[in-house]
A protein has these predicted regions:
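N-terminal and secondary-structure boundary signal
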Residues: 1-294
Length: 294
């Protein structure tokens, strides 16, 4: 296991990240606190994509190890029980974008552990579109937020923050200013205070794209990882940093996206949803770390 704190200089390196800082003003460049204020776990497995029939089991183990480290427990189920009670009604907010959806084995791994905690199957729903009309999500007492990591035309990256846009009745109204108002969705009654876990699925992330609904396999790579945390802003900050470093490695520069992922910083500074300063995020790395990049 390796622990390190990513520096702000790492994150702000390159034109796109500099644009994020400029868009948000000088406040984010102030003196950082001495101690990390958020913890994020990156876990990778060299075999997770190699054997489709064993993928769910590997992902269950990856989630178990990540949560033990994240929450400081000796046993995985102890960690899961810190997040969810058997009496909870749980909505798993997934993402079904057809070109790069949340993998079914990952959804299955999450559901398996919810059942193991004692949540009854009738009180679990995995959904993306239609959550406003979904009876489980309507009465949910706990949410798990999971989505694939990719660039995004309107938001810079497909973030955990962005994944809740289906809770908004008028989704297109959140597109202006690089989706700056996404954090407000997390204040809605169906969402506020309910999210127990955020997972950026970095098994096969897309690190570059331009234009709406862009997808190109040239810009997808088998990273074979999960980025996990209870703080959605911190998880997204690490995820955005990973995509930035990959673009720099691939192109020889941090090639600009349609918009910088500035909504992540807004979610911190305006909506107070978490930590967007990399100098205040403790990143713990587990598992296979060849070409980890961060």
């Amino acid at each position: 296991m390796e622990e390190r704190v990513i520096t702000r200089r790492d994150f702000l390196r390159g034109a796109a990240a500099t644009a994020v800082a400029a868009a948000m003003g000088p406040g984010i460049l102030g003196e950082a606190q001495a101690q990390p204020a958020a913890k994020v776990v990156l876990i990778r497995n060299a075999d997770v994509l190699a054997q489709p029939d064993k993928m769910q089991g590997i992902l269950e183990s990856m989630l178990d190890e990540a949560l033990k480290t994240l929450l400081g427990t000796s046993e995985p189920m102890e960690a899961w029980r810190k997040l969810v009670k058997s009496s909870d009604v749980v909505g798993v907010k997934s993402n079904e974008w057809p070109k790069l959806p949340t993998p079914k084995p990952l959804e299955g791994a999450i559901k398996r552990r919810l059942l193991d905690v004692g949540v009854v199957e009738q009180n679990i729903s995995i959904a993306d579109r239609g959550v406003l009309e979904n009876p489980i999500f309507q009465k949910a007492t706990a949410l798990v937020n999971v989505r694939p990591l990719r660039t995004h035309h309107w938001a810079g990256i497909g973030s955990c923050l962005k994944n809740y846009i289906q809770y908004a009745p008028n989704r297109s109204s959140f597109h202006p200013e690089a989706c700056a108002a996404l954090g407000s969705i997390w204040k809605l009654p169906m969402v506020e205070g309910k999210t127990r876990l955020n997972i950026q699925c970095a098994l096969t992330p897309q690190f570059y794209g331009r234009g709406a609904n862009f997808f190109d396999t040239r810009y997808v790579w088998p990273y074979q990882g999960l980025i996990v945390g209870t703080d959605p802003v911190a998880v997204d900050t690490v995820a955005a940093h990973l995509l930035q470093v990959k673009r720099t490695a691939f192109f020889g520069e941090d090639r600009a996206l349609d918009v910088p992922p500035s909504h992540i910083i807004v979610a911190d500074k305006k909506y107070h949803l978490g930590v967007s300063d990399l100098n205040r995020i403790q990143l713990v790395k587990l598992g296979w770390m060849e070409d980890a990049l961060i």
